[in-house]
Amino acid sequence: MKKLFFGSLLSLALFSCSDGGDDFTENPGDGDVNNGDGTENVEYATEETAYEIPVVFHVFYSQKSQPLEYVEEGHLPKVLDAVNRRFANCGVDLKLQFKLAEVDPDGNVMPEPGVDRQKVRIATMNSTEFLKDPAYAHYMWDQTKYLNICLFKEKNDAVLGISSFPYTLHPDTLAGMPKLMEMRPASELDYPHCVYVNSRYIYDLEPESYKTSEIVGSLCHEIAHYLGLRHAFGEDPVTYSRDCDIDTDFCDDTPTYNKAKYDQYLLSNYPYNGVFTDELVAQLAERTNSLTGEKFVSTNIMDYAVSYLNELSPQQCARIRYILMRSPYVPGPKVKRDDAPTPAPARSAGKKQPFPHRIAY
């Protein structure tokens, strides 16, 4: 989850989110994997496969007259273009691009590419409750074909976005990610497996001066969660507290730091007029590596608060590529398995594994 930092004493509590419920004990796997939907794909993924993922923005609104609900036509393509630029210039070659979906699940050409507008009675909701509620699952389009991004106003103004973590498929393993023991069609997902961003900040698009609510950084951060990345700062594996000096993102090339201590420092230096000068941004973007004591500048997309949010590391790139090539509910070709997959543990007849859904808070 990415959150907004407000310049008040009450705001410190807003940074207590965590990538809750994850298993920190798994180790990355190195095998090939099943082919996704249990059928033989025409195209198989390789390390050189370039992914172009169709995106659909589900815009939930109650009144067309409310621009923070009914996002202006033509704006979301600009947002996605900026997201593509950010990922294309993040310092590693993800071989990844996003495009607005052109057809809906029924094969109809979309009059507004990549945008699915849904009129609802109340367009202000709790995003965590939304991602857990089976009642909203039917809004999602086939996750094997589309990246679903939901937009509505969050009840909590401080929340910028949250995301579902991806799955690996038995016998594959990626540290910190939930695992499916058997493949199930996307139509059986009993919750909205998606990315969410708060539409209150949808127009904070590449502002002239620094804003912690800048939408491109928020959306890139949540998409990266969806593709298997965790926060760059330390999170306790038992309590999920950020007041810890450990490295928990499974990437040795991303420096870690104590987020709770940094938040106290940020609170005491936050501009109460909300204006960030370049000098102040440079000051507040500096962190202290909690393992080595060395100073570093926060540029990683998987950080937040005051950060440049414009880089990923080679090991983060490797995790994203692993998910792209193997995760069942991420669009695009999957790797071909040459050997017979290890059988999943036997289950009672007719009994299916509950989805081990985990949300990146």
For every predicted segment, state its role.
Residues 70-78, 209-214, 218, 296, ...:
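Soluble non-cytosolic domains of exported or imported proteins
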Residues 13-16:
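C-terminal motif of bacterial Sec signal peptides marking the signal peptidase cleavage site
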Residues 1-4:
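Positively charged n-region of N-terminal signal peptides that target proteins for export
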Residues 77-80, 84, 194, 220, ...:
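Extracytoplasmic/secreted envelope proteins and their assembly/folding machinery
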Residues 90-219, 226-271:
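Metzincin-family zinc-dependent endopeptidase catalytic domain
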Residues 46-51, 91, 139-144, 187-191, ...:
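Extracellular/periplasmic catalytic domains that process cell-envelope and extracellular macromolecules
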